[in-house]
Amino acid sequence: MFAADRSARRTFRMNSLFQKLEASPLLARGGPFAVFVLLTFCQGKFGEASRYWFYFAKTIVGAWLIWQVRPLIAELKWKWSWEAAVVGVAVVAMWVGIDGFYPRLDRLLSQVGLAKAKSETELASELWNPHTRFGQGSALAWMFIVTRVLGSSIVAPPLEEVFYRSLVYRYVVRPDFQSVPLGEFRWTPFLITAVVFGSAHQEWLAGILCAFAYQALVCRHKRLGEAITAHAITNLLLGLWVVWRGAWKFW
């Protein structure tokens, strides 16, 4: 009896959540991303190990949220094309290639007095490297590495593309964002969305250029599919580069 009651309450809460998402196109596109960002913020806030466990949690939660909102967001569809593949490869080559030619975001903010400068030791301690926390080559370290590669290439792209390219870009045009055709080109949202996207990454300049490329795909094809695919390819290749070269600073 009690088990049935608990099951009924869970079903009621799930139905209530789905109804709220269905009633608000903005919440359906922005809510999952907000949860994803909140869990990202929690990484490292509850001890060193939480940096990795919260990434694991946000990957699972993010995948579940995508599944929940998928029926509500018509543009949330992957689309393969060679053009998307080329853009994805070009972006990761650019991301790695220009590294070192401009200051990372934390250093830039410290240079303009908006953040405290960090020593090399502090920066090294903040690297997302499971081998240093759980032991070189340990099963737990590799579990988190695989989780990050999969999470960044399968979960993050649809969440971020729906938020930035579908919601933010069109909302900048006008709050009634659904009245703005997906992929309509305008300079103001094109630039603002790219800067917002770039500022969410330590490699801010690469992030801005990356956003230009993904948004160009959306504007060209009038859909998100190619941008999601390009984003996934970029993150997958960058993840493999990080693991192969030990370039943990990109994570």
Predicted features by range, described:
Residues 24-93, 111-118:
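Alpha-helical transmembrane segments in multi-pass membrane proteins
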Residues 2-22:
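Short, Lys/Arg-rich, polar N-terminal cytosolic tail immediately upstream
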Residues 16, 20, 38, 46-49, ...:
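Juxtamembrane loop-transmembrane helix junctions in multi-pass integral membrane proteins
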Residues 74-156, 170-184:
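Juxtamembrane helix-loop-helix connectors linking adjacent transmembrane helices
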Residues 94, 135-251:
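Transmembrane helix-loop-helix hairpins at the membrane interface
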Residues 45-48, 70-74, 104-108, 201-202, ...:
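Transmembrane helix-loop junctions in multipass membrane proteins, especially transporters and channels
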